[in-house]
């Protein structure tokens, strides 16, 4: 028996297997995921909030096909996929200057925190006026909503940085409005809480410093919860949103976001 005769059954089996796979893919409607031509930057987010409150956040979108703002101009509503605890109350679309080959836009979304608890979101659902719907990956966001009202009268949080160049550091600057009160802790992630034992110091009524962030996401969105003690009672104060790493985003970071969106879409 020749070598060629030995190979024939193997080649025939390979042909049959390939044919079955191709037919299966066709019947299932499966196809290779194309590169996303419209996508959002993939953020890692932590948002502390009191129940029955709202917060406006900015989400950056990109398009390689047409003007990014034009893609969403006929959007009727937006929601987080699989998350009913956090509602997008309203939104606006703003054009942004292009970055390299990417047309950019900003979605300013007002989030309404209606239910206490810790929930996640990984995708934004956009419903358009023509009845169509599109889901866009946004990274991994955690919403930490508690039945603890915001005692903003105890702390000035507006002097804290709203953005920086370092994605793995959370900067803070808080000023006590009652010098008899004291800052006890800062929660800046689902399992990340810094207290006085971790080096939080207050000098002349001001707490200032930087807290290290785990992971390697290029940009983090962090809205912290600060615990303040006054007359022996602990109260919650909610900081402003900080876009850690947002001032140093590169075209390579945007390409990575496009690749991630293509994989998870």
Role assignments for model-derived ranges:
Residues 31-33:
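Bacterial signal peptide processing site
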Residues 26-29:
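C-terminal motif of bacterial Sec signal peptides marking the signal peptidase cleavage site
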Residues 66-102:
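Surface-exposed binding patches on compact interaction domains or structured appendages
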Residues 36-66, 161-178:
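Contiguous beta-strand segments within globular domains
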Residues 96-112, 203-210:
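Aromatic sugar-binding surface patches on proteins
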Residues 116-199:
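Surface-exposed beta-loop interaction hotspot
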């Amino acid at each position: 028996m020749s070598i060629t005769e030995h190979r024939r059954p193997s080649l025939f089996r390979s042909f049959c297997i390939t044919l079955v796979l191709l037919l299966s893919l066709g019947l299932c409607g499966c196809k290779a995921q194309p590169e996303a031509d419209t996508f959002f930057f993939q953020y890692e987010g932590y948002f502390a909030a009191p129940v029955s409150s709202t917060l406006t956040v900015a989400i950056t979108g990109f398009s390689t096909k047409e003007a990014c703002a034009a893609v969403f101009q006929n959007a009727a509503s937006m929601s987080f996929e699989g998350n009913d605890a956090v509602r997008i109350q309203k939104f606006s679309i703003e054009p942004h200057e292009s970055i390299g080959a990417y047309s950019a836009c900003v979605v300013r979304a007002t989030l309404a925190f209606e239910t206490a608890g810790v929930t996640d979101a990984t995708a934004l659902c956009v419903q358009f006026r023509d009845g169509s719907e599109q889901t866009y990956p946004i990274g991994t966001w955690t919403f930490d909503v508690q039945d603890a009202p915001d005692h903003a009268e105890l702390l000035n949080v507006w002097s804290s940085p709203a953005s920086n160049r370092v994605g793995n550091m959370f900067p803070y600057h808080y000023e006590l409005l009652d010098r008899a009160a004291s800052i006890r802790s800062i929660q800046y992630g689902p399992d990340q809480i810094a207290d006085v034992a971790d080096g939080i110091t207050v000098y002349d009524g001001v707490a200032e410093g930087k807290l290290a962030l785990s992971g390697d996401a290029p940009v983090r969105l962090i809205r912290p919860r600060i615990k303040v003690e006054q007359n022996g009672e602990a109260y919650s104060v909610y900081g402003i949103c900080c876009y850690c790493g947002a001032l140093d985003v590169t075209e390579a970071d945007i390409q990575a976001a496009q690749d991630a969106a293509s994989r998870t879409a």
